[in-house]
From Swiss-Prot:
Classification of source organism: Bacteria, Pseudomonadati, Spirochaetota, Spirochaetia, Leptospirales
UniProt signal peptide: none
Pfam families the UniProt entry points to: Ribosomal_L10
Domain of life where this protein originates: Bacteria
Name under which the protein is recorded: Large ribosomal subunit protein uL10
Annotated InterPro entries: Ribosomal_uL10, Ribosomal_uL10-like_sf, Ribosomal_uL10_bac, Ribosomal_uL10_bac_type
GO BP terms, alphabetized: translation
This protein's encoding gene: rplJ
Subunit structure: Part of the ribosomal stalk of the 50S ribosomal subunit. The N-terminus interacts with L11 and the large rRNA to form the base of the stalk. The C-terminus forms an elongated spine to which L12 dimers bind in a sequential fashion forming a multimeric L10(L12)X complex.
Gene Ontology molecular functions: large ribosomal subunit rRNA binding; structural constituent of ribosome
Keyword set, alphabetical order: Ribonucleoprotein, Ribosomal protein, RNA-binding, rRNA-binding
A GO cellular component annotation in the UniProt record: cytosolic large ribosomal subunit
């Protein structure tokens, strides 16, 4: 790759890292073109993007990007060979779940690491966040948790008012009789 092409590739990766600062690194060696295309389609449905990397250029982009330059991220020997970065904005658990489900049927996709909200994750960490509910599910659970006690209070107030109304009705019927 010519020097200018490398500079452009680093700039492109740097831009992706600054707009989508959460990512998963995965080894895709052995996957067919059809399998990679299928994985990319699933990831696009979740608002994510998969980019095949040159490891040294990605490491350089990490060090230069505003979101990651203060972190000491290095690649060890386990990061040799063909790697792809799967970029996500804020839905990394959903992306991790897509990768985990895909890897069940395609043993050649091996998740190596991830980066989420300032924390470097190993393969086990990425696997753990794959089990987390999505952002929408968490918001629904929070709303349900808030709504439940409010509904109980409203029901209790309605019961008090209803029992008061029944007592007044009974008193009125007793006085009329």
């Amino acid at each position: 790759m010519a020097n200018q092409e490398k500079i452009e590739a680093v700039a492109l990766l740097k831009g992706k890292l600054e707009t989508r600062n959460n990512f998963i690194l995965a080894c895709y060696s052995g996957l067919t073109v059809e399998e990679i295309t299928g994985l990319r389609a699933q990831l696009r449905k979740e608002g994510s993007e998969m980019k095949v990397l040159k490891n040294n250029l990605f490491l350089r982009a990490l060090k230069e990007s505003g979101a990651h330059k203060d972190k000491n991220i290095t690649f060890g020997s386990e990061y040799q060979g063909p790697l792809a970065a799967i970029f996500a904005k804020d839905n990394l658990p959903a992306i991790a779940k897509v990768c985990k489900d895909f890897a069940k049927n395609n043993k050649n996709l091996i998740v190596k690491a991830g980066y989420m909200d300032g924390s470097v994750l190993d393969a086990n960490g990425v696997d753990a966040i794959a089990g987390l509910p999505s952002r929408e599910q968490l918001l629904a659970q929070i709303a349900g948790g808030i709504n439940g006690p409010a509904r109980t209070i409203a029901s209790g107030i309605n019961q008090i008012i209803a029992s008061l109304a029944r007592a007044i009705q009974a008193t009125a019927e007793k006085n009329n009789a």
